[in-house]
Amino acid sequence: MFLRVLNAVILTVISLPVVAADYQDANLSPEERVRDLLPRMTLEEKVGQMAQYVGIEHVAKSEKNMSIEELRKSDARGFYPNLHSSQMPEVIKTGKVGSFLHVVTAEEANMLQRYAQDSRLGIPLLIGIDAIHGNALVRGATVYPAPMSMASTWNLDLVRRANEETAIEMRATGSHWSFTPNIDIARDPRWGRVGETFGEDSYLVGEMGVATIDGLQQGDFTGATKVIANAKHWVAGGDPINGINLSPMDISIRTLREDFFPPFKRAIDAGVFTFMAAHNEINGVPAHSN
C-alpha cells in the first residue's frame, strides 16, 4: 500500500507542468524578462555578458600555426593568453562569455548555443560578424559591391534591399549582429579602409548609413529575418596621421561637429541599436576612454 501511494505521489510530481522563469517566457516583453533575469545573475555572469570572444573554429585553425610561446602570451591573432580553444566550451558553460564573432557556419553557431544552454541561466549568445557588403565571410553567401561602390550608385533603395537580403543570410548561419555601417568620413586616400566607407561627403555617408540600418534592422530588429546594425567607428577614424589605420587623429572641434558627427546623428535618428567606438586617439585621448 505504501509503495502504491509513493508511486502515485511520484507520478503526480513528474506530471506537473514545468514552470519556466519569467526571463525564459518569450511572451513577455524584453523589459519584463530583463527585470526578472538581472537579479538572478552573479557579478561574474553580468561581466561575462560584456565579453565577446572569437569563434572556436577560428581560434583552433590559428593555433595550428602558432608556437607554444605564442599561444601562452600572444593574442594578436584572435587569442587569449593561456586559453586554448579546447577550454572554450567550459568558459561558455560557466557564463563567462556573452557574445562571439568570426563564427562562419550554422553548425558552429548551433554548437555554441548548445553550450550556452548548458550554463546556469541558459542565456543565449549574441553572434556578430562583419557583413559589410553581404555576409561575405561565409562561404556561399551573396557578396555585394563594397560600400564605396554602393555609394556611387546614389540609390538608397538598392542599398536598403541589399542589406535586407544580407540580414536573411546572416540569420540562416546563426548571426544576429552586423558590424556595419561604417560611416567614417574618408579623407585620406592612403587609409586602407577607404573602400569600406561610403566616401568623403558627410551627407551622402549619412544617407547611405541610414539605408543600411533600415535594411538590416527593418525598424524593430526582432524577427527571423532581421539583425542588429552597428554604426562605426565613433568617431573620426577616416583621416588618420599618415593614412595609417588606427593611428591618432588631430582634429578641430569644428571639423568634428560639421563633418564627422552628422552621419552618427543620422544613425541615431534612424534607430540604430549599437555603436562601435573608434580604435584611434582623438586629440590625444583614446576614443574608447573618452
Model-derived regions: residue spans:
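Glycoside hydrolase catalytic-domain context in secreted enzymes
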Residues: 21-290
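N-terminal signal peptide c-region/cleavage motif recognized by signal peptidases
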Residues: 15-16
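Sec-dependent signal peptide recognition
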Residues: 2-11
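Residue-level detector of intrinsically disordered, flexible termini
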Residues: 7, 19-20
